[in-house]
Amino acid sequence: LDRSSAASDVYKRQVYTSRDAAHKRIKACIENGEPLPYEIDGAAIYYAGPTQAKDGMAIGSCGPTTSSRMDVYSPMLLDMGLSAMIGKGERSEAVCEAIRRNGAVYFCAIGGAGALACKCIPECEVIAFEDLGCESVKRLRFEKFPLIVTIDCVGGNLFKSGREKYCRKG
């Protein structure tokens, strides 16, 4: 995987916010054969629950949520064609394997910088589960949004390789 092109590819895709409550509802839709709020195949999910937008902005503070909370749902969505996930923190081995198996990628966004991140999201539209408030599913457009390729489709894992590189032996 060319890590530089992976990030630029996200800017060409639809990016959807989805956290715990939305993932639970999406899973129920799949299990019940109900329509999904968006096409999973080829999509990117940003684990975030943005705040209300201030005047002149498309979105409020929009920092990443801890991704491991979605690990129970991620392999299923990756097997349905999800191409990218964006969040913070490590992923389970089951998710890492599903990323490899499906040719997907996991990006980390900068935690604690949600107020700055909103400046890189010029478009935001609530598309599903409006009753969930900040956890509703939103369609976003990223523009120069800072991302780090953290787990790639060939087994690269920055969390593991970083520890190996800096771990003292002996």
Question: Residues of each region from the PLM?
Answer:
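Single conserved hydrophobic/aromatic residue that forms the stacking wall/gate
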Residues: L1-A7, Y11
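Short, charged beta-turn/beta-strand-edge "cap" motif at the junction between a beta-strand
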Residues: D9, Q14-S18, C153
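Short hydrophobic-aromatic micro-motifs
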Residues: D9-Y11, Y46-Y47, V149
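Feature captures the catalytic cores and cofactor-binding loops of soluble hydro-lyases/lyases
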Residues: T17-F145
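Active-site/ligand-binding-proximal alpha/beta "capping" segment
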Residues: Y73-S74, T150-G170
